């Protein structure tokens, strides 16, 4: 799938005159800028790229993609097997970023409507994360207490609902079947 960044640029003779926010949660953006066509300024074409923001932009793009997926699929939220490792932790944070980024641009009411969730005025961002993200730590005899504690701490810090159970019986059942 593609994620459209929604970037709007207005330039003249290689000079950037105006720019709107990329990766917006808004339905649309409008940008206006005065351009003098009678006496345009002559400038050298200069492209400056700030590569230090690549990771930040990845987070914005991925959280916007998850936001769009939730809206378009009309799902009630996300369920994540949170192992305490880097991969599942990253996904949990990206879901939480939906709310951080969404609330930076939209009112609580507008965001709640788009996400299909009931938002109360006194709900915190963590409360809202708990409404769209449920996590489960599925431990076995091979799991460490460190991964359990890591998963639990992350879920609590972002407000996700956290469940845990042992799945040794299920693992043994699969192993015996094979």
Question: Residue locations for each model-derived region?
Answer:
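C-terminal beta-strand edge segments of enzyme domains
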Residues: 1-57
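ATP-dependent adenylation/nucleotidyltransferase module used to activate substrates
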Residues: 54-178
């Amino acid at each position: 799938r593609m994620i459209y960044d929604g970037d709007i640029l207005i330039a003249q003779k290689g000079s950037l005159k105006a720019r709107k926010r990329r990766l917006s949660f808004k339905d649309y953006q409008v940008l206006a800028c005065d351009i003098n066509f009678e006496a345009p300024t002559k400038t050298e074409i200069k492209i400056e790229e700030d590569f230090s923001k690549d990771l930040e932009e990845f987070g914005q793009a991925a959280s916007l993609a998850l936001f769009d997926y939730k809206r378009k699929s009309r799902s009630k939220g996300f369920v994540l097997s949170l192992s305490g490792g880097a991969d599942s932790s990253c996904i949990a944070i990206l879901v939480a970023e939906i709310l951080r980024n969404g609330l930076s641009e939209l009112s609580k009411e507008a965001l709640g409507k788009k996400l299909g969730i009931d938002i109360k005025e006194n709900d915190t961002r963590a409360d809202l994360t708990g409404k769209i993200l449920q996590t489960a730590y599925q431990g076995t005899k091979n799991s460490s207490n460190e991964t359990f504690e890591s998963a639990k701490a992350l879920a609590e810090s972002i407000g996700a609902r956290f469940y845990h159970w042992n799945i040794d019986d299920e693992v043994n059942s699969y192993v015996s079947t094979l």
